[in-house]
Swiss-Prot record:
Signal peptide range in chain numbering: none
Known function: Catalyzes the isomerization between 2-isopropylmalate and 3-isopropylmalate, via the formation of 2-isopropylmaleate.
EC number(s) stated in the UniProt entry for this protein: 4.2.1.33
Annotated [4Fe-4S] cluster binding sites: C350, C410, C413
Organism expressing this protein natively: Brucella melitensis biotype 2 (strain ATCC 23457)
Pathway: Amino-acid biosynthesis; L-leucine biosynthesis; L-leucine from 3-methyl-2-oxobutanoate: step 2/4
Protein name per the record: 3-isopropylmalate dehydratase large subunit
InterPro entries: 3-IsopropMal_deHydase_lsu (IPR004430), Acnase/IPM_dHydase_lsu_aba_1/3 (IPR015931), Acoase/IPM_deHydtase_lsu_aba (IPR001030), Aconitase_4Fe-4S_BS (IPR018136), Aconitase_4Fe-4S_dom (IPR036008), IPM_dehydratase_rel_enz (IPR050067), IPMI_cat (IPR033941)
Cofactor stoichiometry and binding remark: Binds 1 [4Fe-4S] cluster per subunit.
Taxonomic placement: Bacteria, Pseudomonadati, Pseudomonadota, Alphaproteobacteria, Hyphomicrobiales
């Protein structure tokens, strides 16, 4: 009888083509997502070697990082480098027979939102993309992670990847989430607990009552930020919530094939007694809405808390880095989080740009107005999310409140397009990274949930969403 295995063990074992004595494996890749930033050199390598894309039907190309989100984006991209990358992806996709969603296609959007909504992402698969937040797809019980440009070329040419197996980590979130606390708060709390290096060398499986109660959108938010916790990937075992989400998607199995697939997917869970190298537990019932205060995703505190004092940190190097973060953020220890005013609000990204996120934000702002000191924007994660939101009338709620209603793309998550912070501007953002300069040169980022960001836009400062009227 074989030893109990984790979910990660099972998917890994199913995809090993060959294994060397030192543990290096050749892993088969089921799905490859491609965007314009990390693919040009990879496709150029194929051109120079005269190689085809081995499995174009298992590859999907989407433009997302560089595209403008302004309503007039059809007029073209002003930045020359960005325009060249977008044009190169369109040309390469055509040359190699890869399906491509341009900015003119309503299916276009952020690659990690597009994959799941098209049914391209399925349980038990290995999925890669030249983007660190590929971990998002792990919400379906898939082994998904980012790869470098040279690896992008390798997967395009061979449909395989050279890898060494990571260790197993279990993060169990027990109990029920209080009102006003979301998946974003869970994952920020996890990163605050383990630190940005806590998951280094591991693949994380998320489990527990609070995780099971989440929608697929919430689960994608959790897995999306696994990389911010240092992990290679994040996984959640598929269940009925997963299967219902997949049914009817354009590229998902149909009919009897779907039923056969579901029977297999039901085996994708960690066996009782399976070994985890590290286990972390959190009590969902005690979690508050969370706000980041520094320049690392581990710098988090309750919305009812205060900016911490780095002098309380024993480690000299870490203490110095936190003082630097406070200096960059323009904050002082002891400042109440609810006293921090914001200049900008960004609701979107592959972390929180889905329909559920927009519904949560709309519920907060309906009938209210954005503070006169705040510039706020909503960027749907895909054309289909935008279409659904408009069908529900959410765009009218946002526009009447004073938000900018934009076209889909990565937008202000990163300063690679026209949406960026000016030096010194402070932003409540639903994205995943608050590094120095991430949203614009000398811009200051606070990571929050969509509801918290929406409330900050109305109030002009952070507020406890649990007390929102």
């Amino acid at each position: 009888m074989s030893a109990p295995r984790t979910l990660y063990d099972k998917i890994w074992d199913d995809h090993v083509v060959d294994q060397q004595e030192d543990g290096t494996c050749l892993l088969y890749i089921d799905r490859h997502l491609v965007h314009e930033v990390t693919s040009p050199q990879a496709f150029e390598g194929l051109h120079m070697a005269g190689r085809p894309v081995r499995h174009p039907e298992k590859t999907l190309a989407v433009v997302d990082h560089n595209v403008p989100t302004s309503p007039d984006r059809i007029n073209g991209i002003q930045n020359e480098e960005s325009r060249i990358q977008v044009e190169a992806l369109a040309r390469n996709a055509a040359d190699f027979g890869v399906e491509y969603y341009s900015e003119r296609d309503k299916r276009q959007g952020i690659v990690h939102i597009v994959g799941p909504e098209q049914g391209f992402t399925l349980p038990g698969m290995t999925i890669v993309c030249g983007d660190s937040h590929t971990s998002t797809h792990g919400a379906f019980g898939a082994l998904a992670h980012g790869i470098g440009t040279s690896e992008v070329e390798h997967v395009l040419a061979t449909q395989t990847l050279i890898q060494k197996k990571a260790k197993n980590m279990l993060v169990r979130v027990d109990g029920k989430l209080p009102a006003g606390v979301t998946a974003k708060d869970i994952v920020l709390a996890i990163i605050g607990e383990i630190g940005t290096a806590g998951g280094t060398g591991y693949v994380i499986e998320y489990a527990g009552e609070a995780i099971r109660s989440l929608s697929m959108e919430g689960r994608m938010t959790i897995c999306n930020m696994s990389i911010e916790g240092g992990a290679r990937a994040g996984l959640i075992a598929p269940d009925e919530t997963t299967f219902e989400y997949i049914k009817g998607r354009p590229r998902a199995p149909q009919g009897e094939t779907l039923e056969q697939a579901i029977n297999y997917w039901k085996t994708l869970h960690s066996d009782e007694g399976a070994h985890f190298d590290k286990i972390v537990t959190l009590d969902a019932g005690s979690l508050p809405p969370i706000v980041s205060w520094g320049s690392s995703p581990e710098d988090v505190v309750s919305v009812t808390g205060v900016v911490p004092n780095p002098d309380d940190i024993a480690d000299e190097t870490k203490r110095a880095s936190k003082w630097r973060a406070l200096d960059y953020m323009g904050l002082k220890p002891g400042t109440k989080i609810t006293d921090i005013a914001v200049d900008r609000v960004f609701i979107g990204s592959c972390t929180n740009g889905r329909i559920e996120d927009l519904r949560a934000a709309a519920k907060v702002v309906e009938g209210k107005k954005v503070a006169p000191t705040v510039n706020a924007m909503i960027v749907p994660g895909s054309g289909l999310v935008k279409e659904q939101a408009e069908a529900e009338g959410l765009h009218k709620i946002f526009i009447e409140a004073g938000f900018d209603w934009r076209e889909p793309g990565c937008s202000m998550c990163l300063a690679m397009n026209d949406d960026r912070l000016k030096p010194g501007e402070r932003c409540a953002s639903t994205s995943n990274r608050n590094f120095e300069g991430r949203q614009g040169f000398k811009g200051r980022t606070h990571l929050v949930s969509p509801a918290m960001a929406a409330a900050a836009a109305i109030a002009g400062h952070f507020v406890d969403i649990r007390a929102w009227k």
